[in-house]
Amino acid sequence: MSLSPDVLVLREGTEGLATEPYVEALRERLPDQEVRLARTPEDERELAPETPVITGVGIDTDLLVEADALRLFACAFAGTEHLPTEALADRGVIVTNAGGIHAPGIAEQVLGYILTFVRRLQEGQRRKDRREWRHFQSAELTGSTVTILGLGSIGGAVVKRLQGFEVETIGARYTPEKGGPTDEIYGFDSTELHDALARTDYLVLACPLTETTRGLIGTAELRTLPPSAALVNVARGPIVDTDALLAALRSEGIRGAALDVTDPEPLPTDHPLWNLDNVLLTPHTGGHTPMHWPRLADILARNLTRLDDGASATELENVVFPSE
């Protein structure tokens, strides 16, 4: 191969998406820089040592040891738990993530879930399967209360897309003093949370998984929800107590659930959630759209421009570390 590039894209794709479109998107946005794709492990080993910017799903310790010139690693995932973060930090490498790039697609999927419950589209499909032309009554979203737990990029995108449906929105976040786009906003304090849940028609979980949010929705919270309420989880499976959710669904304690994430995940083929008619299940595909690479390329291109303009690492977009 020729001289090392300015930006190296590692070979592993994500969510069924090949990396070639990512390379093309970066080249369009960085016309003055050499962007190369490492198609093989040998390419990665050959090009990494003198490349200042590497981007991809992950970087293993063996390759990192060889990446002497590495200044910035742009992770193609929102989560970075799989990265050798200590080794990256020790080498002074700036790490950014893909946080926010999935928000539009996930928010659209949330609306799809909610409207499926509102308009009883599952019942329509069942009658179609039976070739049964018999009317049934559905409802309207207008006048409903939608509660969103987590007001980051995904939660904010959900609220934005609910505008025009004439609904009341309640937001809950770890730092309610920051405010938010919802009509009301609370923290995760138990009393405040239950007050919100008692008035909720559709509960959307869009918060990160932390020690605070793990098991946040359990038996008590599900009992507070009205029986007509539906739960939508596009966050992380363990935010909901699965056994408690199963009990609520089986007893009609809540109307239904739409789950893009589960606990456990992947969901075993013999898990009872598969058999419940009042459950919508998708295999963690809420953010799986062709816009993944263009949005990620936008972030990386903006960050490289900022660095060229003299910005510090902490001024970059989606920076994971250094944090201060």
Mark where each language-model region is:
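Glycine-rich Rossmann-fold phosphate-binding loop(s) that bind the pyrophosphate
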Residues: L151-G152
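Hydrophobic Val/Ile/Leu positions in short beta-strands of Rossmann-like dinucleotide-binding domains
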Residues: V9, V146-I148
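C-terminal helix-to-coil terminal segments
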Residues: A89, N97-Q109, E265-E324
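Rossmann-like adenosine-cofactor binding region
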Residues: P176-P272
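Phosphate-binding beta-alpha-beta segment of Rossmann-like dinucleotide-binding domains, i.e.
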Residues: V93, G99-T145, R306-L307, A311-V319
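Phosphate/diphosphate ligand-binding glycine-rich loop within oxidoreductases
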Residues: P49-Q125
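N-terminal Rossmann-fold NAD(P) dinucleotide-binding loop
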Residues: G155-G156
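N-terminal glycine-/charge-rich "phosphate-binding" loop or analogous flexible N-terminal tail
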Residues: M1-P52
